[in-house]
Curated annotation (Swiss-Prot):
Domain ABC transporter, residue spans: 322-601, 621-951
Assembly behavior: Forms a heterotetramer with UvrB during the search for lesions.
Main location: cytoplasm
Pfam families on file: UvrA_DNA-bind, UvrA_inter
Annotated GO CC locations: cytoplasm; excinuclease repair complex
A Gene Ontology BP annotation from the UniProt entry: nucleotide-excision repair
Molecular-function GO term, any one: DNA binding
Keyword Translocase: no
Protein name: UvrABC system protein A
Keyword field: ATP-binding, Cytoplasm, DNA damage, DNA excision, DNA repair, DNA-binding, Excision nuclease, Metal-binding, Nucleotide-binding, Repeat, SOS response, Zinc, Zinc-finger
Amino acid sequence: MIMNQEYIKVRGAKEHNLKNINVNIPRNKFVVITGLSGSGKSSLAFDTIYAEGQRRYVESLSSYARQFLHLQNKPNVESISGLSPAIAIDQKTTSKNPRSTVGTITEIYDYLRLLYARVGIPYSPATGLPIHSQTVSEMVDIINELPKGTKIYLLAPIVRGHKGEFKREIMDLKKQGFQKLIVNGEVCEIDDLPKLDKNKKHNIEVIVDRIVLDESLGNRLADSLESSLNLAEGITYLEIVELPPAVKSEFEKNQRITFSEQYSCPVSGFQLTEIEPRIFSFNSPFGACPKCEGIGKEFFFDRDLIVPDQRIAIKDGAIVPWGSTASKFILETLKALADHYKFSIEVPFVSLSQNVKDILFEGSGEEAIKFEFHDGSKTQIIKQPFAGIIPSLQEKDRTIESVLIKEELAKFKSEHKCTACSGFRLKDEALCVKIANLHIGEVAGMSIAALQKWFSHLEEKLNKKQLFIAERILKEITERLKFLMNVGLDYLTLSREAGTLSGGESQRIRLASQIGSGLSGVLYVLDEPSIGLHQRDNTRLIETLKRLRDLGNTVLVVEHDEETIYEADHIIDIGPGAGIHGGRVIAEGNVEEIKNFEESITGRYLSGRQTIKVPSETRVGHDNRAIELLGAVSNNLDNVDIKIPLGTFTAITGVSGSGKSSLMIHTLYKAALKHLEPTSKVFPGKYRELKGLEYIDKIIDINQSPIGRTPRSNPATYTGAFTHIRDWFVELPESKARGYKVGRFSFNVKGGRCEACQGDGLIKIEMHFLPDVYVKCDICNGHRYNRETLEIKYKGKSIADILMMTVEDAMQFFEKIPLIYEKLITLNEVGLGYIKIGQSATTLSGGEAQRVKLAKELSRRSTGKTLYILDEPTTGLHIDDINKLLKVLHKLVDMGNTVLVIEHNLDVIKTADYIIDVGPEGGDKGGKIVVCGTPADIAACEESHTGRYLKQYLV
């Protein structure tokens, strides 16, 4: 029935700021919803249409299945008809789990594991030669090398790391006459087995034979080995139960030796028990590196974090884990050490010799030190080696159980590649299996572009048998690689952690996965898929969205990108303004129709009636002062030198993955911050030299991370406006008469807040088969404060009423109070006039959070010596909002500061004073400076992808 309907018909949508709107969305079309930031686009696309589609799907499942799924609340809409099953592909980062990678998300790594398990060839780490299976005769010869009189068990591993009760398997063994098993390391009689938990993994081995080695065994050993190998599909364990007394042997009691009819190196004895997909999984105990447990990283106590500021003396607290005011015991220990090695604890740490520093950090080895400890009238003298700061911290970390102390100790650790697996995450057994001379870790470390090229030539390197086995696997892998290439992610590697991806990258990965699934009849809802994408790659992304449509799906995209709007089959413009000024359908139709709607701000920009103007001249900066970063080599950077003129608006451009963030965030920002704030826990990328920091007093990274993680954080508290509002309420006559202090008007502490909801205004009710429900607190009616506090009013408004005001309303309300008004006007200047000043931080988008931070910086007293770094500040912004944002950023520069933006948006780039274009491509083919200069210089450079697209914006 749904398939025959022409439209998804939404009637009476009132979610958030939507004003009872009716809209028809054509099915099986590429539809763009546009409009100002905060106008209600996401409220319509995600909170109404997607939420209802998802809710209907989940409701159709059994109550058992529903308890594992999040059930959406019914959106505030009268009716939606013609709705298909809905899939949302939003901006949220895929996963913070370090085990989640690009390879696991896209399932390419799963196919790689299968490929290596089926056609990979194991090589001996000792000889470098291919290794082969063992025969029973070879196994007998190895066993006969054990000392005579050794007692052994021959074990057949029936179950290895699988869940279940295994009643049938145990019954079969009983019928075959076996009497003893080893279950999870414990020897058990087969008639007296413990009950196995079907939800836990188990190891079960059959004791096939118990043998004492001597010459009279005859064929018993070979027969028992064959029985064991048959039982366990070619694998058997030998366990040494007891060695004869007074016999020296290289073998040990309880040692296990694995025999396999499959793979073994006769020279080194290196063995592979199996070549199955699970040994290539870093999430399985059968494949994960035992040292790092499949993470690929180790965490070490770092000298630079233990003593972050070497300008401080030991006596004054240079050794941070031992406290800024070290205890008497520690000071006496360090004084004794100083007396022994003839150094002072009162001089800056930096002036100590390297030998003294090594002893302090690592200990005195076997050299004993005379320590004197005074306790009142008693003096205790001990002569022993000094353990060292790092070994002491390691011991504490190993033995302490307190989570809080462990978290505190973690502050002094830095991460490094695992020394056992070199960051590949896998056991040696997995890394010795190769295809075309590469192991699976090396293949996962290639960029998508390099991987596609490697697979295109792989067929030439496989024999006929391997090719026959691998044909279908290769097809699945190459298809998925092609989809990733098409969405502009050719620079990523399969081993890249999901948590390090930007919102745009993770969204495009999920988009590529959806195309790979080949579903049809689905409603896809996407949130700005063009974010983080260079103009060059935008065309490929749009073609991908159209391909999704051509599979028979409805593609609904919330988007501001002009090219995407032009390519859409149908456009819905929500507005006209943001917040309470939005929530209406202003215009509908194709791009030419949208241009003609006078009320549509989008239409004005599309038609050229309104534009972002190119500045008539560019700034040259402060007397040729500049920050110079030399020899940057972090990630893919190729020994890069850059010069950033101070007092300018500088844009860093380049295709996705070219090295912009590596250069600006991971190297420049972190290096400058480390210099200005030595105690900060940041690890800059490698570079040779950083000059010009004497010209700045602050460096600020205004990013899109949340301004708070609880409902109590809000724009008013973050910007400091709420502090002044509370101060104002305390000074009111009624407050003074009652003796109220500032804490009375805080919802974070006892006194004035409602204790029933602890100042949240909501009470969480846990449901079993349904999602948790938040209901308005019936004591304070959602106002957060108790009745006495709410009785204090200014101009007829309580403090709770003020928190419910929009920024615009609050500005009018407090226009005569400069301290509050100045904080609020900056929020309005960055285009956030529509948000409520008490709006929960958890409900703000990344772009809104970034602009709240920007507003906070604007409200500070400027020194004119600040360097601001913003990574894609146009994320989530309509072109009209970008126009407002540019005025704010240029205002910061006019105050003498330097603004550095990493940006793809050409309307922003064209207004820059100076541009640094990184590239020319992404990944290994990037990391170089293509061109630097004014927008005109960039546009004139033929090698610059940015310049090619910028040219038409400068006309």
